[in-house]
From Swiss-Prot:
Its main location: cytoplasm. It is found in: Cytoplasm. HAMAP family: IF_3 (MF_00080). The gene is infC. IF-3 binds to the 30S ribosomal subunit and shifts the equilibrium between 70S ribosomes and their 50S and 30S subunits in favor of the free subunits, thus enhancing the availability of 30S subunits on which protein synthesis initiation begins. This is Translation initiation factor IF-3.
């Protein structure tokens, strides 16, 4: 019995552009190493100019007529591209959702501590999930919980905007606050 396996290819990997002798066009629009346009030349002339400069001839745009090629150091070009992608990935921050739990009888001191933490989360660019849990007979006084969440919303108006208004899920009231966009 023969088991056929599929070869997995990395979907992110882009095909490399044709380089030097691998370019199939007879004529190309050439851009020099300095970025200046040389004009339309034969492929042999373009490869000769690239070899004189001790650089590579790289096909930039195969769709154009004639194809656009550039004289450059291809290895250095790949390195710079990889470096830029790494910097972009490093600078990309994933916003997390941080949760703070309240109770209907949360005292003023505890409220202020939790509020400070919410301010810190929002100023760091994270979303904040404010949950208020009811126990036992506290469910009969849901309006106290709503008042507390309205107070939290009012206290955080300069740091964030309410993304999800207070909503009762089982024995919990929940609200999500997103940080304000920086200008």
């Amino acid at each position: 019995m023969i088991i056929k396996r599929e070869m997995r290819q990395d979907k992110r990997a882009q095909p490399k552009p044709p380089i030097n002798e691998n370019i199939s066009a007879r004529e190309v629009r050439l851009i020099g190493a300095d970025g200046q346009q040389v004009g339309v030349v034969s492929i042999d002339e373009a490869i000769r100019l690239a070899e004189e400069a001790k650089l590579d001839l790289v096909e930039i745009s195969a769709d154009a007529v004639p194809p656009v090629c550039r004289i450059m150091d291809y290895g250095k070009h790949l390195f710079e591209k990889k470096k830029q992608a790494a910097v972009a990935k490093k600078n990309q921050k994933q916003a997390q959702v941080k949760e703070i739990k309240f109770r209907p009888g949360t005292e003023e001191g505890d409220y202020q501590v939790k509020l400070r933490n919410l301010v810190r989360f929002l100023s760091e660019g994270d979303k904040a999930k404010v949950s208020l849990r009811f126990r036992g007979r506290e469910m009969a006084h849901q309006e106290l919980g709503m008042e507390l969440l309205k107070r939290v919303e009012a206290d955080l108006v300069e740091y964030g905007t309410v993304e999800q208004h207070p909503k009762l899920e089982g024995r919990q009231l929940m609200m999500v606050i997103a940080p304000k966009k920086k200008k």
